[in-house]
Amino acid sequence: MPSGSHWTANSSKIITWLLEQPGKEEKRKTMAKVNRARSTSPPDGGWGWMIVAGCFLVTICTRAVTRCISIFFVEFQTYFTQDYAQTAWIHSIVDCVTMLCAPLGSVVSNHLSCQVGIMLGGLLASTGLILSSFATSLKHLYLTLGVLTGLGFALCYSPAIAMVGKYFSRRKALAYGIAMSGSGIGTFILAPVVQLLIEQFSWRGALLILGGFVLNLCVCGALMRPITLKEDHTTPEQNHVCRTQKEDIKRVSPYSSLTKEWAQTCLCCCLQQEYSFLLMSDFVVLAVSVLFMAYGCSPLFVYLVPYALSVGVSHQQAAFLMSILGVIDIIGNITFGWLTDRRCLKNYQYVCYLFAVGMDGLCYLCLPMLQSLPLLVPFSCTFGYFDGAYVTLIPVVTTEIVGTTSLSSALGVVYFLHAVPYLVSPPIAGRLVDTTGSYTAAFLLCGFSMIFSSVLLGFARLIKRMRKTQLQFIAKESDPKLQLWTNGSVAYSVARELDQKHGEPVATAVPGYSLT
């Protein structure tokens, strides 16, 4: 076909597509009305408790199973005749991949559905565990048990946690406490069961059975019924337009370079809208705080038992300390969530989170002075309780900053930020122990890291409140009839009286004032 007729054919297709847009606009308006009819407030119960149960099982099948992988440590080391460092990489890889790929889980959940994401993750995790039962080398386990299983867990973990936040508002902290207690309860139950399976069926049989158990993630995914909330920052019209734009992109992108450029622009706009919270100053501060918090919390679970042994505690008593820490962690998950949902603390959940992180940091600072079992038992109780407390409030604090709509994507980023500290903090602590000959420097560094995390968030919140108070004072001084609002950089004063013609408030910039 001549080039001129080719251009004419392409042009006619584009013109036809453009002529169809008015009809599509009517369809979009109709769908927007349907979406508005379906939107609802968080039910704070009902099917929400099934979502909590599903998330509880997800945390058992992901975080508890990950913790139980350490039970295979001696079996892997003996069978493959490898040293501690090589064998320890298995646990580090699965934990790191789970956190690193958490944003991928959010993307799949947002663009397909939470149900599809969790079911797909369950299939991948189960496949990884089953293939691991046929491993012939540690490198095989790095790929199957580490990467494949970790990727499956990542697709399940953050979407399930985000779904709880969509179904609860008044009792959100309690719901998260119950859901995330699955990690501690699952470890408490699965640890002896996995040890029994290894004794009865060898490590290969135990991994095969765990692979079948993890398939329950697919059942959990089926429980995650989607819900549309009234308070979502993106309106139903915006959501439908974004979906329709993606369909249009697939339909017209082959026709011309112009439509390809338009398609890329639309995709960038959709992604920019989904991750717009990354530009929020509050979220940036939270992200930095999470890095320091994650660095501090990890080494204790690796070095508490060795430290107890170094101060003269027996092997059985040292293991008992870890059991205490795990059980109290569960209590902290549930009770602290319930307490912060009470009316007297409901508006101070952010402060409660800071308090819990700071208390764990103080426990670290006291640990080098505790050199007997009667002193280490109260330490395990205190650290375990506040560890469970702040883990419960991480999604609550994230919701307060970014809102419910962006919660899944934001949690993906927050858990992604845990990955590198989880990977590097135990080796750094070990190097400090080897260099100094004691655990003091390692524990002090972890303690100051967690305290800095708490102080940083608290200081940022204090500055934000001082700024808000100052802006309100300026507005009242300039004109008592004016109300103040801000776009993040420039302060505006808005008259309470509405314009009679258009029914819209009149906004004028506050002279001589800027937030930056």
From Swiss-Prot:
Keywords tagged on the record: Cataract, Cell membrane, Disease variant, Membrane, Transmembrane, Transmembrane helix
GO BP field: creatine transmembrane transport; creatinine metabolic process; transport across blood-brain barrier
Annotated phenotype, changing R67A: Abolishes creatine efflux activity. Does not affect plasma membrane localization
Organism: Homo sapiens
Catalysed transformations (reactions): creatine(in) = creatine(out); guanidinoacetate(in) = guanidinoacetate(out)
Function field: Functions as a transporter for creatine and as well for its precursor guanidinoacetate. Transport of creatine and GAA is independent of resting membrane potential and extracellular Na(+), Cl(-), or pH. Contributes to the process of creatine biosynthesis and distribution.
PANTHER family: MONOCARBOXYLATE TRANSPORTER, MONOCARBOXYLATE TRANSPORTER 12
Subunit comment: Interacts with isoform 2 of BSG; this interaction is required for its localization to the plasma membrane.
Effect of D95A: Decreases in the creatine efflux activity. Does not affect plasma membrane localization
Protein name: Monocarboxylate transporter 12
Annotated compartments: Cell membrane; Basolateral cell membrane
Gene Ontology molecular function, alphabetical: creatine transmembrane transporter activity; transmembrane transporter activity; uniporter activity
Pfam families with a match to the protein in the record: MFS_1
InterPro entries membership: MFS (IPR011701), MFS_dom (IPR020846), MFS_trans_sf (IPR036259), Proton-linked_MCT (IPR050327)
UniProt family annotation: Belongs to the major facilitator superfamily. Monocarboxylate porter (TC 2.A.1.13) family.
GO CC, any one term: plasma membrane
CDD domains cross-referenced by the UniProt entry: MFS_MCT12
Superkingdom: Eukaryota
Topology of this chain in the membrane: Multi-pass membrane protein
Annotated tissue distribution: Most highly expressed in kidney, followed by retina, lung, heart and testis. Very weakly expressed in brain and liver. Also detected in lens.
Activity regulation, free text: Creatine uptake is inhibited by carbonyl cyanide 3-chlorophenylhydrazone (CCCP) and by valinomycin.
Effect of D387A: Does not affect creatine efflux activity
Transmembrane segments annotated in the record for this chain: 51-73, 88-108, 116-136, 145-165, 178-198, 207-227, 283-303, 319-339, 350-370, 377-397, 410-430, 440-460
